[in-house]
């Protein structure tokens, strides 16, 4: 949809082939910009009846509320001027608008209401569309593209008109603003698939309006290990993961000899990738983990 910290825009195509084709309910516990879902070919999931967007950040859930009303959203966004490809001189009022919107929607006492909901969605897109990819939007600075790039707000608006994206918007059944544990309780079933993409270990404070701290990683592990359905979990590796989701069980036989390796039920897949959001080459490579209970 649009650049967002922790988003799976670059890695979503790798994740999708691991999603079972026979699922009836698709749920993301930390949906963000829903990149994995948008990379799915819906025709490949003939039994899919229910799609659940869930995020604890109310700005995200409000954005998706209006993305489902794509014509209205597009019309509203078209009233917000932004940088143009090939136009090197950026009017100073664009940065002023950005700073005003950023200060307003990220203030501690800000409330989204029925009356301001559409306006807030537009202002949020305006801010997300003019910061460095993956930056924390409430503290990031305005980026002047100097005519070298097309504004990401306009790219987002293109998606609102795109038939493929519209098909995906129309398929979204419920938009939730719940803690991950509550959304699991509400939608778990033998035919449910959960994709979990939590704030990564030691990066919890990078996220806007988050309610996920270091102790919540173990809570998440305990919750998803007990579900009826299937899950995929994205992370970078950290020491506790092998304890919570062991790949192998080791049995020691007589004379302290290694007796066997037994498969535990958790599948680990890994992929190296480049992080688009990094400005330092030495920090621009990561290894993405996908842990599954199938």
Q: Which residue stretches match the model-derived regions?
A:
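Short, solvent-exposed loop/turn segments at secondary-structure junctions
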Residues: 33-36, 57-59, 130-133, 180-183, ...
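S-adenosyl-L-methionine
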Residues: 1-36, 43, 281
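Short active-site oxyanion
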Residues: 22-26, 48-50, 169-173, 225-231
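SAM-dependent nucleic-acid methyltransferase catalytic core
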Residues: 1-14, 69-195, 199-205
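SAM cofactor-binding core of SAM-dependent methyltransferases
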Residues: 22-103
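Short His-Asn-centered micro-motif
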Residues: 29-30, 54-55, 176-178, 196-198, ...
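Long, positively charged, glycine-interspersed low-complexity recognition regions
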Residues: 213-294
């Amino acid at each position: 949809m649009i650049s967002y910290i922790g988003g799976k825009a670059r890695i979503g195509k790798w994740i999708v082939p691991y999603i079972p084709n026979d699922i009836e309910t698709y749920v993301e516990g930390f949906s963000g910009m829903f990149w994995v879902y948008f990379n799915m070919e819906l025709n490949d999931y003939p039994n899919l009846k229910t799609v659940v967007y869930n995020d604890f950040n109310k700005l995200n859930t409000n954005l998706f509320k209006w993305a489902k009303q794509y014509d209205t959203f597009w019309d509203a966004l078209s009233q917000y001027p932004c940088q143009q490809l090939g136009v090197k001189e950026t009017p100073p009022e664009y940065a002023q608008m950005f700073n005003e919107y950023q200060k307003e929607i990220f203030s501690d006492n800000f409330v989204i209401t029925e009356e301001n909901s559409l306006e807030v969605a537009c202002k949020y897109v305006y801010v997300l569309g003019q910061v460095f990819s993956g930056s924390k939007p409430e503290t990031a600075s305005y980026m002047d593209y100097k005519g070298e790039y097309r504004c990401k707000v306009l790219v987002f608006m293109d998606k609102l008109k795109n038939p493929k994206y519209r098909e995906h918007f129309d398929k979204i059944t419920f938009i939730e603003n719940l803690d991950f544990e509550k959304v699991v309780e509400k939608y778990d079933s033998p035919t449910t698939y959960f994709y979990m993409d939590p704030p990564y270990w030691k990066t919890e404070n990078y996220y806007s309006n988050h309610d996920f701290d270091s102790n919540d990683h173990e809570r998440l592990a305990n919750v998803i290990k007990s579900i009826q359905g299937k899950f995929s979990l994205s992370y970078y590796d950290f020491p506790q993961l092998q304890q919570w989701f062991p790949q192998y069980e080791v049995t020691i036989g007589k004379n302290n000899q290694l007796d066997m390796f037994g498969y535990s039920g958790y599948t680990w897949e890994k992929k190296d990738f480049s992080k688009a959001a990094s400005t330092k080459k030495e920090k621009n490579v990561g290894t993405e983990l996908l842990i599954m209970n199938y």
